[in-house]
Amino acid sequence: MKNLKKLIAIIMVIALMIPCTAMAATESPSKASLKGNTTIVLSKKSFTFNNKSQKPSVKTVTYKNADGKTVTLKEGTDYTVSFSKKSTKNAGTYKVTIKGTGKYSGSVTSSYTIKKAKQKNVKVTNKYKATKAKTFKKKGKSYTFKATGVKGKAKVTYTASSKKFKVKNGKITLSKGIKKGTYKVTVKVAKTKNYSAYTKTVTIKVK
């Protein structure tokens, strides 16, 4: 009999607790989703490759709630920041992910770019000086001709405007019997992962 009374008492306590638990669950607010309601402002959207890691800071993250009110969120309290790649050094596009925490859920992204750098330090060393055609009447001659200051291990090609002279392996060779005239050598530095292409035209004069 005593055991029966204890059992009834336990059942009554459980029955009283169920509505309270349900009410607490109902009253607990659901997390607000950042998707479609969030604006991210980065300190910078574009960089130029400089062989160093480059990341923008997150200036502001604002959220528009159901009432239409815009709220400024706090990093660490309302969201965390992460980048799509561990290394942010090379040229390319990078994503910045804002992930909700605390009262907020979901995630939104923004992006920024690192542009290729220009080949600013390319110089063409040309030891050839304007020479009279009669100098090449009996035989051709070679002179130093090469591009220096090229970055990023870019491939360099030289294109001559005439078959009467050649540019190869850092030398320009004017062939025997070359005529008077103005010739050109086009120096092309190919683009690489982090550097844009570069082109320069050098004039060769035979008097």
Q: What do the predicted segments below correspond to?
A:
Residues 3-24:
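Sec-dependent N-terminal signal peptides of Gram-positive bacterial secreted proteins and lipoproteins
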Residues 25-69, 116-155, 203:
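Solvent-exposed, low-complexity, repeat-rich "mucin-like" stalks and linkers
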Residues 32, 37-38, 77-80, 103-104, ...:
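Short glycine-aromatic motifs
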Residues 42-43, 60-66, 84-85, 90-112, ...:
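Enriched for extracellular/lumenal, surface-exposed ectodomains of secreted and cell-surface proteins
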Residues 67-105, 164-186:
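Serine/threonine-rich, repeat-prone extracellular segments and beta-strand-based repeat modules
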Residues 151-155, 180-182, 196-197:
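Interdomain linker/hinge connecting the two RecA-like lobes of the SF2 helicase core
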Residues 158-160:
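Conserved aromatic beta-strand anchor motif in extracellular beta-sandwich/beta-rich domains
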Residues 206-207:
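Short, solvent-exposed mixed-charge patches
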